A protein has these predicted regions:
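Conserved ABC ATPase signature
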Residues: 144-148, 152
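Catalytic Walker B motif of ABC-type/P-loop ATPase nucleotide-binding domains
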Residues: 169-172
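Conserved ABC transporter NBD signature motif
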Residues: 68-79
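The feature captures the beta-strand-to-loop junction immediately N-terminal to the Walker
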Residues: 45-47
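Conserved ABC ATPase "signature" region
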Residues: 104, 108-111, 116-140, 192
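A short, proline-enriched helix->beta-strand linker immediately N-terminal to the Walker B motif
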Residues: 163-167
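Helix-to-loop junction immediately C-terminal to a conserved catalytic motif
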Residues: 60
Length: 277
């Protein structure tokens, strides 16, 4: 991975949510510089409201920066990306569609799949069923969301995000509402999918254990206006089993990250930097 090309590049990126805030130099995120290798798994942690979700919107092209440049897969971001998939804390499955039909939804609405969906329905459905089997939902493909547990719904949500075989998966607190045991099961499922397919992953989470277990690199964001203040490479060898979370090395990294975030909570926010003209 060290010799892989850069897949995500942020160069001095600033975002104000409207022109009035821009005139006041009031930014949601500021001075973001980031380079992520192709196939890398990164996690972003930080206090609530620090700009983590804003960063995700910039990465997917849902928001354009006020200043700076963003490249994804060596191409400028000029609008919503088709090469990315997203999953959130709420699975948001459509209640009138079966599990497999929920997973297929992106293929029905996103080109180039949309125009060929009817002709290739059987092929796409086979892909969806295989993906559901990989995440442990074999036998539940034709169930409705109300027949699935929260963990099962989140597995289906991840499958939906991956059905169009994106180059990048963005996860915004995907396991935050789940119990500890289910959460750890899904860590392992995500780990296995990433290991097999080697897409890029950007994970936003408040769970430091989750970030250290899954990521190659963890970034800590400051309080708003958000900027990256710590980059911590996770030097725990892969493949990682859950037993690694009980080791001294793992615990030390978690405590180190917690210390960075705790220090930010104790300090008074300094005045935001002024963006370059």
């Amino acid at each position: 991975m060290q010799n892989s090309p850069w897949f995500v590049e942020f160069s001095d990126v600033w975002l104000a949510y409207n022109d009035e805030l821009l005139k006041q130099n009031h930014f949601a995120v500021e001075a973001i510089d980031l380079k992520v290798r192709q196939g890398e798994f990164i996690a972003i942690v930080g206090p609530s409201g620090c700009g983590k979700s804003t960063f995700m919107k910039l990465t997917t092209g849902l928001k354009m920066p006020s200043k700076g440049r963003i490249l994804i897969d060596q191409q400028p971001v000029t609008g919503p990306l088709k090469i990315s998939g997203m999953a959130f804390q709420a699975p948001s499955l459509l209640p009138w569609r079966t599990t497999v039909d929920n997973v297929l939804l992106p293929l029905e609405i996103v080109e180039p799949y949309r125009s060929s969906f009817k002709a290739k329905r059987k092929e796409y459905e086979e892909r969806a069923r295989k993906l559901l089997q990989k995440v442990g939902l074999g036998g539940y493909e034709d169930k409705f969301p109300w027949q699935l547990s929260g963990g099962m719904q989140q597995r289906a949500s991840i499958c939906r995000a991956l059905i169009h075989e994106p180059k990048m998966l963005l996860l915004d607190e995907p396991f935050g509402a789940l119990d500890a045991f289910t959460r750890e099961e899904l860590w392992c499922i995500l780990r296995d999918l990433w290991t097999e397919q080697q897409f890029n992953v950007i994970l936003v989470t408040h769970d430091l254990r989750e970030s250290v277990f899954l990521a190659d690199t963890v970034y800590v964001m400051s309080k708003s206006p958000g900027r990256f203040v710590v980059k911590r490479e996770i030097d725990i060898p892969r493949p990682r089993d859950l037993e690694v979370t009980y080791t001294q090395a793992f615990g030390d990294i978690v405590h180190e990250l917690r210390g960075h975030i705790g220090a930010m909570r104790k300090t008074t926010l300094s005045a935001p930097a002024v963006a370059p003209a």
